[in-house]
């Protein structure tokens, strides 16, 4: 029935395209009407459209005419030289109907899927122009600085011709330059530049003059799937150096390396014994049928299963797994030990190891034997694995009658410090083990100039300046024997998911989005529209070729390269890591095939390498760097011989990455071909392939070196990829659910901070803080539920110590309710503060004269105090939230939902944060004293130093400079 309705009414995509096509026809009609206009008259259309918008006409109504204006300008500029990245090239683009269709979809808030070479960059100009007519902020977000600069210079020339201003955000631009850029009608930049400016404006800027952004109205995200999905779990973090080094990484790195080496030696021994035993039974090609022999072989396979849990990449294990029957036996043991009834036997087997490595979930676990080895031989401590029960410890202290109240407090402080040290040591130990067992050099990171540089797993690009969080970066530095730098402290953070939700309107464009349409809809409320191609794609997509072993696969790849290279086709070979690209490069050198390598180690030559990749006979080996955002243009000779030939050395866990690699060839009607080579040793195949696939290869194993190639295998691979994508989507959605809690708190704090910065008079905000603090303290200390009881003297003592002020207890005793007492205390505090404020104004006026705005100076002092304590307490809160997030998962043991627990406890933490901010602000305001000096100063400069009363160590001095017109004698 559903299929019948689709055939009758058309799919949702078809109906949307049909509706937008009517608007395309209107655009073309307006384009003809604009043809007779002079250049000046066409430019004036921008002024006219802006005026019409201000008078109430909607953007939707103006869309056909505005898009026609852009199209007409493109036609008029044909042949005009444009400088792009230092080179001159003639403008030669006029939007096709399919590009106009895509532009309409972007304005309507769609993600447009347009194939490589279909002109996404030009398509974006039309919605950018239309939305910039509002005068509100309009941004185009790219994946790197180069593309932002290129697009601004190239297609931005259309916008500038029409009288709009354009700017490009480049990393490292100074404050004043960035403010000027944000004032432009259209701003180009990377997601991180826009995101970090948002964080700086809301966490570092202390005045309106230091804030650069002007809001979030409309954004188009280029390569939207990369930014909103691949990078969604990577938060933007502004951080600074921590207060001190964690000595754990120095102390434990050699001990951890020794424990991992013991594990490696144990697994090597088990694997070698199993291989020798197997060689006695069979020639590794034909499995015997004798039952006793098979049982013996099965026992050796059990040992290899154990090796797979200790060192999954063991060479002997990988060699044995090339035999389909032996692979099946090892997998059979895996299934056997996963059964609930065999759990105890599984634990007994795994107890032989020191560490259990879970490659599938990228995790590990120390066994009892590993812990014992750590204590007995590695010089570790049993306390490294035991956390203190703080409730029990505090209870013991409270019940110890021999301790005085002061001793109990000191003992609790000591216990708390010991608990903190134990947790830090245990955390450092775990991160050192993670670095040794799960983080691979030239896969997850590279080592350069005494530094660890992260490699982006999706793009293959180096990420200098980024660091793994939670001490993992220091652990890798210890592993690789480079300088171990201080752990960073987070000042501000936001995920890209929540940052882009700030925009009133959001759109995107990419060549690969339809496979993630569900996630775009559920997370961002964005629909995906597949835009038809202008020219038919001529790419030949060959079936994947499957080989039993990695060795056979590489042999086949080299043969394919040699064959295609002989015909003259340019070849692009895509690899999944730096390690694989270098390995393949060595093989090609041995076979005397000239080639160029592009990976994270030589990314500086990217533009030069890509420019030559489309030439006749070129061979380029590249990581995922060449899979997205790169446009390989063919020379005429390469087109004649059949275009670019793309070879994939493995399938990525995401289908989109594979589609991006295929999309490098056959752009805009050019010829091209793509083929992927896989082996059953590839990570995707080992961890996520269907059991059906293993059964098939057991029955249909081809001769050595011969490929298996069939659409059925392609389907099975796609199923494995879907399984991984579903798992990753669940992880991203789960992460977002937690970050949504943090996001609400972030927005509340940032709103309060901005209110302080932008308010001309912060005095009412200070009074409000004083009011809340006095209510809270008075209610707490005078409460009958409080341990001190209903005690006004206690209240007086606390107020005198904290602020300090003296209360009129006789007046308070006349009041009969706690609310009345709290209100009276609040009024008294506010009155004292008003008097203090007036005194400060008088002091400054006396010192600097009437020409100085003394009230303004005092307001600036109050503003600085308030912002300082918001920032300090927020940093502490971020640490507390991280700790809560890492610990809350353990609540599942008590049959509790971690997310609900996180929401509940984070709310309590936030209440505590607000309380601590108010108390810190009020304490500081009441302890302020002004010091006026003129010694060794220019005649008209008077420093005003606001210091804390009684030299409180929590509040340092702040100095403001007052420029006075008065002479020195006044």
UniProtKB/Swiss-Prot annotation:
Per UniProt, ATP binds at 99, 117-121, 631
The record, for Gene3D superfamilies, names: Helical scaffold and wing domains of SecA, P-loop containing nucleotide triphosphate hydrolases, SecA, preprotein cross-linking domain
This enzyme catalyses: ATP + H2O + cellular proteinSide 1 = ADP + phosphate + cellular proteinSide 2
Q: Which GO terms describe its cellular component?
A: cell envelope Sec protein transport complex; cytosol; plasma membrane
Source domain of life is Bacteria
The EC number(s) attached to this protein equal 7.4.2.8
Q: Which GO terms describe its biological process?
A: intracellular protein transmembrane transport; protein import; protein targeting; protein transport by the Sec complex
List UniProt keywords, sorted A-Z. ATP-binding, Cell inner membrane, Cell membrane, Cytoplasm, Membrane, Nucleotide-binding, Protein transport, Translocase, Translocation, Transport
Q: Where in the cell is it found?
A: Cell inner membrane; Cytoplasm
Function of the molecule: Part of the Sec protein translocase complex. Interacts with the SecYEG preprotein conducting channel. Has a central role in coupling the hydrolysis of ATP to the transfer of proteins into and across the cell membrane, serving as an ATP-driven molecular motor driving the stepwise translocation of polypeptide chains across the membrane.
- UniProt subunit comment: Monomer and homodimer. Part of the essential Sec protein translocation apparatus which comprises SecA, SecYEG and auxiliary proteins SecDF. Other proteins may also be involved.
NCBIfam families in the record, alphabetically? secA
Database matches in HAMAP family: SecA
Q: What is this protein called?
A: Protein translocase subunit SecA
Q: What is the lineage of its organism?
A: Bacteria, Pseudomonadati, Chlamydiota, Chlamydiia, Chlamydiales
Name of the coding gene = secA
């Amino acid at each position: 029935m559903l299929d019948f309705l689709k055939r009758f009414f058309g799919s949702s995509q078809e109906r949307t395209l049909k509706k937008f096509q009517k608007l395309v026809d209107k655009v073309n009609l307006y384009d003809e009407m604009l043809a007779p206009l002079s250049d000046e008259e066409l430019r004036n259309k921008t002024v006219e459209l802006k005026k019409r918008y201000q008078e109430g006409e909607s953007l939707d109504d103006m869309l056909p005419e505005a898009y026609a204006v852009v199209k007409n300008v493109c036609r008029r500029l044909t042949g005009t030289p444009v400088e792009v990245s230092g080179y001159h090239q003639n403008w030669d683009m006029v939007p096709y109907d399919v590009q106009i269709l895509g532009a309409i979809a972007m304005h309507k808030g769609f993600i447009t899927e347009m194939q490589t070479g279909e002109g996404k960059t030009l398509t974006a100009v039309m919605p950018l122009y239309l939305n910039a007519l509002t005068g509100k902020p309009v941004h185009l977000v790219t994946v790197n600085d180069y593309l932002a600069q290129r697009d601004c210079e190239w297609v931005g020339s259309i916008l500038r011709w029409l009288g709009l201003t354009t700017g490009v955000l480049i990393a490292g631009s100074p404050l004043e330059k960035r403010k000027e850029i944000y004032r432009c009608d259209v701003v180009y930049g990377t997601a991180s530049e826009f995101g970090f400016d948002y964080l700086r404006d809301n966490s570092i800027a202390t005045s309106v003059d230091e804030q650069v952004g002007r809001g979030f109205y409309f954004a188009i995200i280029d390569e939207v799937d990369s930014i909103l999905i691949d990078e969604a779990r990577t938060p933007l973090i502004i951080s600074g150096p921590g207060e001190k080094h964690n000595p754990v990484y120095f102390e434990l790195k050699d001990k951890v390396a020794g424990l991992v080496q013991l594990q490696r030696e144990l697994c090597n021994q088990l694997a070698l014994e199993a291989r020798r035993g197997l060689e006695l039974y069979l020639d590794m090609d034909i499995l015997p049928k004798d039952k006793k022999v098979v049982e013996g072989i099965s026992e050796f396979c059990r040992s290899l299963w154990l090796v797979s849990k200790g060192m999954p990449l063991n060479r002997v294990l990988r060699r044995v797994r090339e035999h389909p029957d032996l692979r099946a036996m090892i997998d059979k043991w895996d299934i056997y030990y996963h059964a609930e009834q065999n759990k105890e036997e599984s634990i007994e087997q795994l107890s032989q190891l020191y560490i259990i490595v879970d490659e599938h979930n990228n995790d590990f676990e120390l066994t009892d034997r590993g812990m014992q080895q750590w204590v007995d031989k590695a010089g570790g401590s049993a306390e490294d694995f035991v956390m203190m029960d703080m409730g029990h410890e505090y209870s013991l202290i409270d019940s110890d009658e021999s301790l005085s109240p002061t001793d109990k407090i000191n003992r609790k402080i000591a216990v708390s410090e010991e608990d903190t040290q134990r947790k830090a040591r245990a955390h450092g130990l775990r991160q050192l083990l993670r670095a040794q067992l799960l983080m691979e050099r030239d896969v997850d990171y590279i080592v350069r100039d005494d530094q660890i540089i992260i490699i982006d797993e999706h793009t293959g690009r180096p990420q200098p300046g980024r660091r793994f969080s939670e001490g993992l970066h220091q652990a890798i530095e210890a592993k690789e024997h480079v300088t171990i730098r201080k752990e960073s402290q987070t000042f501000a953070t936001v995920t890209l998911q929540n940052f882009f939700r700030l925009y009133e309107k959001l759109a995107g464009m990419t060549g690969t989005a339809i496979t993630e349409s569900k996630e775009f809809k559920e997370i961002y409320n964005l629909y995906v529209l597949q835009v038809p191609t202008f020219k038919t794609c001529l790419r030949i997509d060959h079936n994947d070729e499957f080989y039993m072993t990695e060795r056979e696969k590489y042999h086949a790849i080299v043969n394919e390269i040699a064959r295609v290279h002989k015909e003259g086709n340019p070849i692009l070979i895509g690899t999944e890591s730096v390690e694989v690209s270098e390995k393949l490069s060595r093989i090609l050198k041995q076979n005397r095939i000239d080639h160029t390598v592009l990976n994270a180690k030589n990314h500086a030559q990217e533009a030069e390498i890509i420019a030559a990749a489309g030439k006749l006979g070129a061979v380029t080996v590249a990581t995922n760097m060449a899979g997205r955002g790169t446009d390989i243009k063919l020379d005429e000779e390469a087109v004649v011989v059949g275009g670019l030939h793309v070879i994939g050395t493995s399938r990525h866990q995401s289908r989109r990455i594979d589609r991006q690699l295929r999309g490098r060839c056959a752009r805009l009607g050019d010829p091209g071909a793509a083929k992927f080579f896989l082996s059953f040793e590839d990570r995707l195949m080992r961890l996520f392939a269907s059991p059906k696939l293993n059964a098939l290869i057991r029955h249909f194993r081809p001769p050595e070196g011969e490929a298996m190639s069939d659409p059925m295998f392609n389907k099975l691979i796609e199923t494995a990829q879907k399984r991984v994508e579903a798992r990753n989507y669940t992880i991203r959605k789960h992460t977002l659910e937690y970050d949504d809690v943090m996001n609400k708190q972030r927005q509340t704090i940032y709103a309060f901070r901005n209110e302080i910065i932008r308010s001309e008079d912060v005095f009412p905000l200070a009074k409000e803080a004083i009011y809340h603090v006095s209510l809270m303290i008075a209610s707490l200390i005078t409460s009958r539920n409080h341990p001190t009881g209903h005690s006004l003297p206690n209240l007086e003592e606390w107020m005198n110590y904290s602020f300090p002020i003296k209360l009129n207890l006789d007046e308070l005793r006349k009041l009969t309710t706690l609310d009345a007492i709290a209100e009276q205390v609040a009024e008294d505090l506010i009155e004292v503060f008003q008097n203090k404020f007036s005194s400060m104004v008088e002091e400054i006026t006396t010192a600097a004269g009437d020409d100085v705005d003394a009230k303004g100076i005092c307001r600036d002092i109050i503003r600085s105090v308030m912002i300082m304590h918001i920032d300090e307490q927020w940093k502490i809160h971020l640490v507390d939230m991280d700790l809560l997030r890492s610990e809350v998962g353990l609540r599942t043991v008590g049959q509790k939902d971690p997310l609900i627990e996180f929401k509940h406890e984070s709310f309590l933490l936030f209440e505590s944060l607000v309380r601590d901010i108010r108390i810190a602000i009020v304490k500081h305001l009441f302890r302020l004293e002004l010091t006026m000096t003129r010694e060794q100063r220019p005649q008209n400069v008077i420093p005003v130093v606001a210091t804390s009363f009684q030299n409180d160590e929590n509040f340092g001095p702040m100095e403001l400079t007052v420029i006075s017109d008065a002479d020195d004698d006044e």
